Amino acid sequence: MNLEIYLTGKVKTKFILEGVEQYLKWIRPYHKIKITSFPLAGSTSANRDQIKKKEGERYLKALQNEKNVVVLHERGEELSSMEFATFIKKWQNSGTRKLIFIIGGPLGFSDNVLSQNWKKLSLSRMTFTHEMALLVLLEQLYRAETINRGMIYHY
C-alpha cells in the first residue's frame, strides 16, 4: 500500500529531520511513501480564519478525488499502537492502494477540511508542532508494520 503524508509547513529542525529520514528508511521496504509540504498561508498574527481557509483550500484541491484520507486532528479518535496497527491492516486488506494522512499547520484545519467525510485520528490529547506530528506518525506507521509482521520492535 502506498502512503502519502501532506503537511502545512516545512520540517526545519535538525533532529526531527534526522528522525524523519530514519523512519522513512525503515518504512520504505514495506511501503512506498511520499511526503508533501505546503507553505504556511501567512503569519499567525494575520487573520486566522483567512489563513485556515486558504490552507484548507490547498488540501481540498490536492485531495479532491481522494477517498482514503486520514485527518490528524486533536478531536480525532485516539488509538493505541495495537489498534493503529489493526487500522492499517484493515486498509491493506481492503485492497486500498493508497492511504493519505494530513497534518495541519499551527492554526489547525478549517471547517471545510473537517467537514469532509474523512477519518479523523488523534496522535494524542496533547498538541504537537507539524514537525513533531510527522515524526510521531512515521514512528507509529513503522511500529504498526512491525506489529502486523510479528517483528520485534513493539513490546
Curated annotation (Swiss-Prot):
Provide the alphabetized UniProt keywords.
Cytoplasm, Methyltransferase, rRNA processing, S-adenosyl-L-methionine, Transferase
Which positions bind S-adenosyl-L-methionine? 72, 104, 123-128
Keyword rRNA processing applies: yes
Name of this chain's protein: Ribosomal RNA large subunit methyltransferase H
List, in alphabetical order, the Gene Ontology terms for molecular function in this entry.
rRNA (pseudouridine-N3-)-methyltransferase activity
> Per the record, GO CC terms?
cytoplasm
> At the top level of its lineage, which domain of life is listed?
Bacteria
Q: Which Pfam families match?
A: SPOUT_MTase (PF02590)
Subunit comment: Homodimer.
Catalytic activity annotated for this protein?
Answer: pseudouridine(1915) in 23S rRNA + S-adenosyl-L-methionine = N(3)-methylpseudouridine(1915) in 23S rRNA + S-adenosyl-L-homocysteine + H(+)
Q: Which residues form a coiled coil?
A: none
Write down the InterPro entries for this protein, in alphabetical order. Alpha/beta_knot_MTases, RlmH-like, tRNA_m1G_MTases_N
Q: What does this protein do?
A: Specifically methylates the pseudouridine at position 1915 (m3Psi1915) in 23S rRNA.
Main site of residence? Answer: cytoplasm
Its localization reads:
Cytoplasm
Q: Which family does it belong to?
A: Belongs to the RNA methyltransferase RlmH family.
Enzyme class comes to transferase
Q: What is its EC number?
A: 2.1.1.177
| Presence of keyword Transferase | yes
